[in-house]
Design a protein with these regions (language model features):
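Alpha-helical transmembrane segments and membrane-interface helix-loop junctions
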Residues: 1-78, 82-185, 540, 588
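Alpha-helical transmembrane segments of multi-pass membrane transport proteins
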Residues: 115-117, 154-731
Length: 731
């Protein structure tokens, strides 16, 4: 009977989490529809949305704790039984006590943090915030009761509750003071001596807590616990922690994180990956390194949308490794390529780390995305170069280009290909400019065909149109001239001819017919450009980041469930069950790491660090080199979301002192952390790849070393050539 009740509770908990996650797309979507078709807005939709993010975070955190999937940095340290079992229990008790302290402070904040009559819709805000209390309380209990290795969990729950109550005692006093007048006398008597105890015990507890991360303590407990104990040490209000969590989670742009994450999981769980691989393989397998290029592009695509390199390695690693191994690539090369490619998409829109950095640094997220495009391409091209060089040196077999195969693959994957373009057009608002330039190009080419070539036969006309039109349009976009001059047109036409000659050279080497092969590449680009233009002309929508995320999620859901029918409605729960640990885990970390960021800033640590660095380091370039090294080390030990919240605030003032563009600093930050994922001994991608390919971490590290060097070169170029980041910022 007990197990049945527990299963019902778990099912209800999961269902509420799934519903809240799906519902995040509703309010942005309604806002878009109301604004563009009815010229109005949905009343207080942003308020509903951000508080729904709050609910999703803590419901997701509860589900994540039940699944034991909160992010950890657990190492296999040489500790033998029975000490290992004892250490495990002590770590779980410590984590539970810290989480119970969070619950006490959240309760005090919920009761006293807002005006009594404040509501979100018809729900009083203080009752809505009880989801924070419920979330922390549930996660704390599961540290004890959710562990099979703990016997008599009820016995261990008692010291966890007592220690958590001592750590959060000042919040307990605030709970009673706010809800029923003055606190009971015994609480007032205990407050002063317990505060003295916490002042003395905070430092050793912080040391123990930091060490516990190597024995399985979740990262959110360690980051939040360190901040909490630092505030307790200074006798500061402990309600700062839930206040900062609330502030972070109710920031408007944060809603894009769960929406894009769910979009990525919807894509990775059906046959979208297979279709994209088939499409890229049909287009690129005819030239040296084509299959490696396919793997890199697919990895970049999925990492961009999931925001987590681990998801790409785990979801796509098996299929991509099979294709590469059977395509003639060695096992060592394949593992190294896929491990290193797992994070190269993190600089492209709509990457979640870029969003979080922009929000944290208070920089335009759109500018961050613009700044990341060329550096991201540098990383991708570096990886592609490695693939091509390997294929040439090892004489990897190429495949003749098949027009029908490419056309079929394009038709099958068109819906997946269109999604990033729709996001790009909606968010960056390039539609109107593109239409003008495309029209000029079409007229120019028709005049060229009819008056100069004097041949208006359909086959050649279409061939010329489909071949050069989109490429010339691309050149116009790069020149970014509102009214293209004849000089610009001439340069664009020359570039088009050079492109055609290059493709013809490769195709001729394979013995292929240029006339039958060339148009397929151009038709692909032309069709995509045409659909993009049609979208821009008919809809004329300019979307916010969150609205773009909502449209992407709804679009993907419709494609995969209604049109493709790869996913059944009943299968959505499985997809969301895999997505929630990322959403709940990441947002929980962000909410608590924001408290640590607040402490660092409030204590003037960035100012002090800036003064010290400025006194020791006088050269901008030496500072940048040291920054690269520090961030690579940080990337080894901290996942990217924690690093952004904890480390980024420390470097903002340093960047200002040395005159570094804020967007450039952000791209350096993210690119260096990416490199840390590949750095031994505990780079995240190395650990995940070891798990996915069933190989020792040492062997994975050796396989990845050459790619690590290539990405190091790319990171140095990004660091010391700021034009790569700033070139597109003014466009």
């Amino acid at each position: 009977m007990e197990n049945k009740v527990l299963r019902l509770i778990h099912a209800g908990e999961s269902s509420l989490a799934y519903l809240s996650l799906l519902s995040l797309a509703v309010f942005p979507f309604l806002d878009v529809m109301a604004r563009h078709f009815f010229h109005t807005d949905v009343n207080n939709s942003n308020g509903y949305l951000v508080h729904l993010v709050l609910v999703t975070t803590f419901l997701g955190g509860m589900v994540t704790s039940r699944q034991k999937k909160h992010l950890t940095l657990s190492l296999e340290l040489p500790v033998k039984e029975p000490f290992q079992a004892i250490l495990y229990i002590l770590v779980q008790v410590l984590c539970a006590s810290i989480t119970f302290a969070f619950a006490w402070s959240s309760l005090a904040f919920s009761l006293n943090g807002f005006e009594p009559g404040k509501k979100i819709g018809i729900v009083p805000l203080k009752w809505l915030l009880m989801v924070m209390v419920l979330g922390y309380l549930t996660m704390g209990i599961r540290f004890i009761f959710g562990q099979e290795r703990i016997e008599r969990p009820g016995l261990w729950l008692i010291p966890a509750v007592l220690l958590g109550s001592v750590i959060g005692f000042s919040s307990i006093v605030q709970v009673f003071a706010g809800s029923a007048g003055p606190p009971p006398a015994f609480l007032a008597v205990l407050q002063a001596p317990l505060q003295t105890v916490m002042t003395q015990a905070a430092t050793p507890l912080i040391i123990v807590l930091v060490l516990s991360v190597f024995f399985g303590s979740p990262i959110f407990v360690v980051l939040g616990g360190v901040a909490y104990l630092l505030f307790a040490h200074q006798a500061a209000p402990l309600e700062i922690m839930p206040n900062q969590a609330y502030t972070m989670l109710t920031g408007y742009s944060i809603a894009a994180i769960p929406l894009f994450a769910l979009t990525g999981f919807l894509l990775s769980e059906d046959k979208a990956g297979e279709r994209l691989i088939k499409f890229f393989r049909a287009l690129f397998s005819w030239f040296p390194g084509g299959l490696a290029v396919v793997a890199i592009l697919v990895c970049a695509f999925f990492t961009t949308f999931t925001g987590a390199s681990g998801v790409t390695i785990l979801a796509m690693g098996g299929l991509l490794s099979y294709i590469l191994l059977h395509g003639g690539y060695g096992k060592t090369f394949t593992i190294g390529l896929l491990t290193a490619s797992g994070s190269i998409g993190l600089l492209f829109p709509p990457s979640l780390p870029v969003i979080i950095y922009g929000v944290t640094a208070q920089i335009s997220v759109k500018e961050m995305f613009k700044g990341g495009i060329l550096p991201g391409l540098a990383l991708v091209l570096g990886m592609m170069t490695m693939g091509i060089v390997y294929a040439v040196r090892n004489d990897v077999e190429r495949h003749r280009f098949q027009f029908r195969e490419a056309l079929t693959a394009f038709r099958e994957s068109i819906w997946e290909i269109l999604m990033p373009l729709i996001i790009f057009v909606g968010y960056f608002g390039v539609g109107a400019v593109l239409v003008k330039r495309f029209a000029v190009v079409v007229v120019f080419l028709l005049v060229l065909e009819v008056l100069i070539c004097r041949e208006s036969g359909t086959p050649k006309l279409l061939n010329l149109f489909f071949t050069f039109t989109p490429i010339t349009a691309l050149f116009f976009l790069l020149f970014h001239s509102p009214s293209p001059s004849w000089i610009v047109i001439g340069i664009a036409a020359a570039g088009s001819a050079a492109y055609g000659f290059l493709i013809a050279y490769f195709m001729d080497g394979l013995g292929a017919d240029f006339r039958s092969v060339m148009p397929v590449f151009a038709r692909f680009i032309a069709l995509v450009a045409g659909l993009l233009i049609l979208f821009a002309v008919t809809v004329k929508i300019s979307l916010t980041l969150v609205e773009s995320a909502a449209i992407a999620m709804i679009y993907t859901l419709i494609i995969q469930v209604v049109i493709r029918r790869d996913l059944k409605i009943r299968d959505l729960s499985k997809v969301m069950s895999k997505c929630l640990p990322i959403v709940g885990g990441v947002l929980t970390i962000l909410s608590l790491a924001n408290g640590l960021s607040y402490y660092l800033i409030d204590s003037d640590i960035p100012v002090k660090l800036t003064a010290w660095v400025h006194a020791v380091v006088s050269s901008k370039y030496v500072f940048l080199l040291l920054l690269n090294l520090v961030l690579i080390v940080v990337g080894c030990f901290l996942e990217i979301y924690s690093a952004i919240l904890v480390v980024a605030p420390l470097i903002f003032p340093l960047g200002h002192v040395f005159g570094i563009n804020p967007v450039h600093l952000g791209i350096i930050f993210l690119a260096s952390l990416e490199l840390g994922y590949l750095t031994p001994p505990v780079g995240l991608n190395l650990l995940l790849s070891s798990y996915r390919f069933n190989e020792p971490v040492v062997k994975v590290a050796k396989s990845t070393f050459k790619f690590l060097l290539i990405q190091l070169v790319a990171v140095l170029l990004i660091t010391y050539l700021p034009i790569l980041t700033t070139l597109l910022l003014k466009k």
